[in-house]
Amino acid sequence: MATATTTLHSTTGTVYVADGTTDGKVGYYNHTDDSTNVIRKPIPIEVEDARTLSKSPTTKAEGYQLVNFHTKIPEEHFLNSKLPENKELIEEVYFDECRRLVQEVTGAAEAYPYVYRVRNQEQNAKESNKSNFHTDFVPIVHVDRDDVTAPQRLRASLGAEKADMLLSKYKSYGSINVWRPVKNMVQKWPLMLVDHKSIEDWDYSTHMFTLHSSNDERVATRGAKEHETILTHDKRYRYIYASDMTPEEAWLFFAFHSDPALGIPHGAFWDDSTKEEALTRCSIEVRIWVFFD
């Protein structure tokens, strides 16, 4: 596991989860006017520092792992990731770096990077309460896909024929995130992972809330997505983060896994110890389809 000097064992903060709807109907979000009937509930939490846990979590056992990771790509390419030449470099060189890292750590038989996101977070806690699910950072705890939407995205990413071949060939599969800070150590809105190992029957259908979208322009680039999948509260959850995370480290976690026990809800959280002068958090995540014998 990656290491760093820290005096923290845990911190406190706030995350947001789904708490039903205002009208008792199916949850919806309209991208045209930002309207929704979903109740977003703030939850005060204690967040354990992964650096001081007695046993380091692993992707194979817990579904998430903190690792050392160095890229040969200079940071300015990530900070200006929308430029065509930088996008090409990320998708060719950085994708391959992430693929090799993921296969080495997880033991995946095959791995296919398929998308990246660069996020910048400047808001404070009060401003975040006004934001929606599709801002440039995500304070709402979620998984990227579930057992309904993962096959949809897999086929959109790799093509239906190849996707179906891989699904029939391997015993299990998932979408793993390689999440890493860019430029600075994380001082604001660290990434938080939800450990639900203590809940034996945890499943996407029992502990996640489905949010149906309409008028989503991203369908053209990422394929259809029937719904977003947002966490509902359970007092048995453990919350994990890594203090003072640097660009030389990365979280690997399953944002979806065909075995729900390894699927990790996640999201940015407001750390109560955040200093007023804390720098903007910039991060990059790469999502990778992985397949296991």
Swiss-Prot record:
Its EC number is 1.-.-.-. Pathway: Secondary metabolite biosynthesis. GO terms for molecular function: oxidoreductase activity. InterPro entries: AsaB-like. Keywords: Oxidoreductase. NCBIfam families: CmcJ_NvfI_EfuI. PANTHER family: BLL6449 PROTEIN (PTHR34598), OXIDOREDUCTASE AN1597 (PTHR34598:SF3). Oxidoreductase; part of the gene cluster that mediates the biosynthesis of squalestatin S1 (SQS1, also known as zaragozic acid A), a heavily oxidized fungal polyketide that offers potent cholesterol lowering activity by targeting squalene synthase (SS). SQS1 is composed of a 2,8-dioxobicyclic[3.2.1]octane-3,4,5-tricarboxyclic acid core that is connected to two lipophilic polyketide arms. Belongs to the asaB hydroxylase/desaturase family. This is Oxidoreductase R2. It comes from Phoma sp. (strain ATCC 20986 / MF5453).
